[in-house]
């Protein structure tokens, strides 16, 4: 039985859970899972890197199967951008592996510290949803272990119904052992960022439609506390891969880490209102453009360790 706590990023319940390494299981047999976990009710659920919100990957009476130990990238074709890796490989590992060859994840969420299996199980979306769809559209095949069958190789041609159900299946269709995905060809990882400050919700909708047409990536921050004429004010941030720039795929180290869980959240009431006001005015009126590192554009919160506290 493992010592670390296995919990979701939103931390809805913090209790110790049984967990074993998936690499220790040659086959997904309930009796073997129970024996290695030292108990449990016979149920088991895959666990990625604990970056999901809500109560995903909570199986208090059963056993979690940790997909990270021993996870590695098996193959990458720099000509076609097709990669095969274990489910426990992190997006950060994939980026470092493929960026020098001019490739990037076709869909990525707001953190690089998710697993490949977790991305499939949640069918994640990113800032380019309007162009690339969800992550599942880029999955070519899945190697799936089930307790009631032999290991299955699933794709749009082989076991298509199970393949479709596993994408966004939250781990309930079986244990994803590995997956093959397609990547996005990019000139660099540096992002040409365009930020437009808007005064109200009506302005946002007009800007957002234009941004989706012109840019690969688009996302907005809205001041949810603003009222009256300022209702819905915020920033629209759009981006595209710069023609020249960084291609190492190495993100910067965190600036700081939250050491403790405060008894009361500091982001509430007047403090949150003051933060929103300052953040809104951080962007100059009108539109500004600049070049930014990929991790600053895609993963700004990754620079604050344990910010979920």
What are these regions (language model features)?
Residues 1-309:
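Noncatalytic alpha-helical scaffold of FAD-dependent oxidoreductases
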């Amino acid at each position: 039985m493992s010592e670390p706590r296995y919990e979701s990023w939103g931390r809805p319940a913090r209790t110790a859970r049984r967990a074993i390494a998936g690499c220790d299981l040659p086959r997904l047999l309930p009796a073997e899972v129970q024996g290695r976990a030292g108990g449990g009710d016979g149920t088991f659920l895959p666990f990625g890197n604990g970056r999901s919100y809500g109560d995903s990957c909570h199986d208090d009476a059963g056993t979690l199967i940790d997909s990270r130990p021993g996870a590695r990238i098996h193959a990458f074709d720099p000509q076609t951008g097709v990669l095969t890796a274990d489910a426990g490989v992190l997006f950060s590992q994939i980026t470092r592996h493929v960026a020098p060859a001019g490739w990037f994840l076709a869909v990525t969420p707001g953190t690089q510290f998710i697993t490949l299996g977790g991305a499939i199980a949640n069918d994640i979306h990113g800032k380019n949803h309007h162009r690339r769809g969800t992550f599942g559209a880029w999955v070519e095949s899945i190697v799936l272990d089930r307790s009631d069958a032999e290991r299955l190789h699933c794709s749009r041609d082989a076991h298509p119904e199970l393949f479709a159900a596993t994408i966004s299946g939250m781990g309930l269709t079986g244990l994803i052992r590995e997956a093959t995905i397609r990547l996005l060809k990019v000139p660099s990882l540096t992002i040409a960022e365009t930020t437009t400050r808007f005064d109200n919700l009506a302005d946002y909708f007009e800007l957002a439609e234009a941004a989706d047409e012109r840019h690969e990536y688009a996302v907005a921050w809205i001041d949810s506390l603003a009222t009256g004429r300022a209702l819905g004010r915020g920033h629209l941030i759009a981006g595209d891969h710069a023609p020249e720039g960084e291609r190492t795929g190495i993100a910067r180290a965190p600036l700081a880490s939250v050491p403790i869980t405060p008894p009361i959240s500091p982001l509430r009431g007047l403090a949150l209102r003051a933060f929103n006001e300052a953040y809104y005015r951080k962007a100059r009126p009108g539109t500004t453009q600049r070049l930014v590192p990929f991790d600053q554009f895609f993963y700004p919160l990754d620079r604050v360790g344990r910010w979920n506290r």
